[in-house]
Amino acid sequence: MNRTEAREKATALVAQMTIEEAASQLLHSSPAIPRLGIPAYDWWSEALHGVARAGTATCYPQAIGLGATFDRELLQKIAGSIALEARAKYNAYSRLGDRTRYKGVTMWSPNINIFRDPRWGRGQETYGEDPVLTASLGCAFVEGLQTKRDGYLTTAACAKHFAVHSGPEALRHSFD
């Protein structure tokens, strides 16, 4: 199926949905729509440094450590390896009818937030404070996750936390 055929098929499928059915698909945990042959799917899968939340997998260093390498090619290879493991797990879990959280191929990765304040508790999930480095490594990670095999994406990347994730949450950077 080519891109045009896929778009036409998706458009026709959505046109058959009720408003309630379409709205139900907007959550990370999308329920099945049996009358249309749509299985349940949970869009929430993470791949910042591997896919071990759904069982055994290779665990790579946190993003801050990967950022310290300044190595775009390395990050692309790591992400490609993560994508292969994610696809293999997805295929295995799907055969069992298990499409719950962390078992999909839609990856909420990479984190392209800029690490602005060392007091923020999730800085290790970022590539650091340099926007140019973050852009370069983030693109490489997406390219690796979205490596095509047999004409299809291995996984689909969703770069996260671009806008204001490290603030300004109330009281995030203060103490009593």
Residue ranges, per PLM feature:
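Glycoside hydrolase catalytic-domain context in secreted enzymes
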Residues: 1-176
